[in-house]
């Protein structure tokens, strides 16, 4: 099933650009379009000065278009936001830098603050007074207008009631703020019945354990609540059932997530439990559980932990603290998926270095060095660290597997959608040396996610995010190897909820470093700039295509657009236009020449024509170019122009050599099966256009690492081109088993791109190989209709 967002091109404003000329060309990739009958072009005689003059005029026209053309739709707000992008980037940088020493940027929990407020003064000599009067003050300052406490931006009845009950109990315990206490109590009385209608998919963590304990405290204080309400009877029953399932010995034997809700339990052996404190002094990073333990034990480290928390949060405390690992990893993930991570390379590297130091062989926790690890944070760390070149073993997932099933936390009562989603994403970054565990993890997570999608149940127990179902569907429909950066970003711009997303702990909370409106504004402005530039480049490319009469060689306008899209979807940075356009023009011209050579292959004359083209390209034989073969002549002129546009000096010779090698792959026997050679031509062109190849060409020729990258890319793309042809009506010979073979080679390619310790080849050049291979994977994976939907979405549909 394709995602709804990937609509057919015919429904979008630029549909005329995307309509196929005929059914058959739709079934071909930009690599292997079959030729239509060739219409002989007229004689095209240009000298180099004319070509350069034409290009100068083209560029002037581009400049005129850019200044004259308003943003698509004439949206002044969009224009304003794009002009403000540098300021937004600086603001985000400042926020990321300010958080570098933070233990987590999260909102305060009224519930946890209430438990802190309940702590009696430890050195009071028997006199009752609050140990943390700042917590009382925070409660008094943060009551909502309707009398409740909780998340002001989203109403979930469990969140509002447990926060409100906790605050009312705290105020009543110390006999302060009577008016606010009365308003809170009235809110509880008016809304208690709603518990019977609450959605259990979004239950607050440990609610059935902790809410009854607060009710008991309220009853002892004589607060007027209907303790026999039917909704409460159900919660009491769930509490008894859950407590009966918790072996007392297991609770005290090792650190588990049960430590997070200790305030809801009784008859505890504190001497044994205090062994499981986190390095920061807390019990499982829970202020509420730590406050309860402090009341019972007077432990100095618990006291210091709570003092640190309320000092950092102006008298309050979050529901979980610290969350430094989670905060850093998820913010990096969001910036990457929003397509703006390139602006924050140093900040991201610092965050990932921090995460790497906190990753243990058993995995990672959400905060500090908490002994209880979880698969969610482990998966995010594994994926991001591997993609940034860190040496991370796949054995970190072994801790979360039992009898072929995977869990987020040991002893969990239900599976988390987002934990399996993030684990599925991580399981696709596989190296050849990894054991079968990652493949097993991928299969398990995919089966789980597919089952949830089939039943329409794509909500999660830890986050409320409207875009989550779409995120999961995209991950299932487009594996990492076939997901292009600009496609993923364009879709994610509509999935990312920014500040509207809420996380679920013992109450709702927000992660301001993860879900940030400024991220979204900056990403939209950045993408709008990309679209503006892409539309101008597309107009220029179309003029080039028409001027060189490439339509006469069977190249349709649609295939030109697809070639540009594949280049722009991978290489999208504004300062890399030469690489992007070099890729696109090379793909288009390769298709035109391939179409011409196929005409000769039909009568066994491809070898001779190939030799003549190579001779004309290498020798600048202008007499030969004026021969009667006008089709070949026009292609040589176009090729000459391409080289002049994208290469200078020695780089020009390198680009001619790249084309020569590509032409040499054409023989009567090959019948145009040159997908691997075309991939290498694209890689070489991109590197030459970037200026990287010329400066390192000699060393690369002697590099075994570079040679192996070429071998892998050529092999993979040759297989994928064969698959594309078979899907589109070509021969089915040698197609069986291609996917498995490509997957094996992809493992080695991923390792050579992200896990190599060799310095022979730059990381950017390695990424070029991967970009080109992924573009082949994308074409092989997607239907023509899906590709055209992506073209419309990425290039022509404005970001709202």
Swiss-Prot record:
Family stated for the protein in its record: Belongs to the terpene synthase family.
Domain notes: The Asp-Xaa-Asp-Asp (DXDD) motif is important for the catalytic activity, presumably through binding to Mg(2+).
GO molecular function, one term: ent-copalyl diphosphate synthase activity
Transit peptide: first to last position: 1-47
Factors inducing expression: By UV irradiation.
Species lineage: Eukaryota, Viridiplantae, Streptophyta, Embryophyta, Tracheophyta
Residue stretches of biased makeup (Basic and acidic residues): 55-69
Positions that bind substrate: 242, 461
Presence of keyword Transit peptide: yes
Name of the gene this protein is made from: CPS2
Keyword Nucleotide-binding: no
GO CC list: chloroplast
PANTHER family found in the cross-reference section: ENT-COPALYL DIPHOSPHATE SYNTHASE, CHLOROPLASTIC (PTHR31739:SF4)
Organism for this UniProt entry: Oryza sativa subsp. japonica
Keywords of the record: Chloroplast, Isomerase, Magnesium, Metal-binding, Plant defense, Plastid, Transit peptide
Record's protein name: Ent-copalyl diphosphate synthase 2, chloroplastic
Subcellular location: Plastid, Chloroplast
Disordered as annotated region, ranges: 52-80
Reactions the enzyme catalyzes: (2E,6E,10E)-geranylgeranyl diphosphate = ent-copalyl diphosphate
Extra remark: 2 different ent-CDP synthases exist in rice, one being involved in gibberellin biosynthesis and the other in phytoalexins biosynthesis. Phytoalexins are diterpenoid secondary metabolites involved in the defense mechanism of the plant and produced in response to attack (by a pathogen, elicitor or UV irradiation).
UniProt motif (DXDD motif) ranges: 374-377
